[in-house]
């Protein structure tokens, strides 16, 4: 006789739990829109770091490169090689896009461990790496999707869409689904790895403040760099695939 009241009570409890938010966020109200300010603030910091580094690197170029100029030339050469390997001989126009993706994600990931975000106090929530937020990673993935659609359409025109019915029209649903899963996998892989890394460090620091978290932080820096490389490599591979028309 008490089954129905118990079931209702259980459902009510589950409903209450579903309304609980994990963490707090700081928002700006601009017009009728609610803007996630934390991500914008940290993204602007990362962009400022990148632009400042570029200005310093090209401010006074030398015929015989200095250490700083050598470093940035090495980074550029690395990005060019990555783009050429994945895209092919028509890689040139895509070097800025791939380079921007790689450097923004790399610096964003490292900023979570190296920049003292905690000293900046907000009315709600706290600052963290931009890639620690799903909004950032989804935006980067959607930009990548737009890029490889543009690459395919600019080279092949409307015949680009023939790839959806090749080698047989039976694969049409699977080929369409693939274009939805690409941005999903890109965004959730990056978001999950960065969020997990920061959570592990926070937990270890709260439990054992000294010594133990340091190796984990170094491991996190390594994996953060790898995640930036994976994202940039896949973005270049998708662009190359859309231009070549093979899977």
Curated annotation (Swiss-Prot):
Would the keyword Plastid be found if you checked this record's keyword annotation? Answer: yes
**InterPro entries given in the database record:** ATP_syn_F0_a_bact/chloroplast, ATP_synth_F0_asu, ATP_synth_F0_asu_AS, F0_ATP_A_sf
Topology relative to the membrane: Multi-pass membrane protein
Q: Where in the cell is it found?
A: Plastid, Chloroplast thylakoid membrane
Principal cellular location given in the protein's record: plastid
Give this protein's Gene Ontology molecular function annotations: proton-transporting ATP synthase activity, rotational mechanism
Q: Where does the record place a coiled coil?
A: none
Can you cite an annotated GO cellular component? proton-transporting ATP synthase complex
**What keywords tag this UniProt record?**
ATP synthesis, CF(0), Chloroplast, Hydrogen ion transport, Ion transport, Membrane, Plastid, Thylakoid, Transmembrane, Transmembrane helix, Transport
Assembly and interactions?
F-type ATPases have 2 components, CF(1) - the catalytic core - and CF(0) - the membrane proton channel. CF(1) has five subunits: alpha(3), beta(3), gamma(1), delta(1), epsilon(1). CF(0) has four main subunits: a, b, b' and c.
The task this protein performs is described as: Key component of the proton channel; it plays a direct role in the translocation of protons across the membrane.
Q: What family does this belong to?
A: Belongs to the ATPase A chain family.
NCBIfam families for the chain: ATP_synt_6_or_A (TIGR01131)
Q: Identify this protein by name.
A: ATP synthase subunit a, chloroplastic
Say which species the protein is native to: Agrostis stolonifera (Creeping bentgrass)
Q: What is the lineage of its organism?
A: Eukaryota, Viridiplantae, Streptophyta, Embryophyta, Tracheophyta
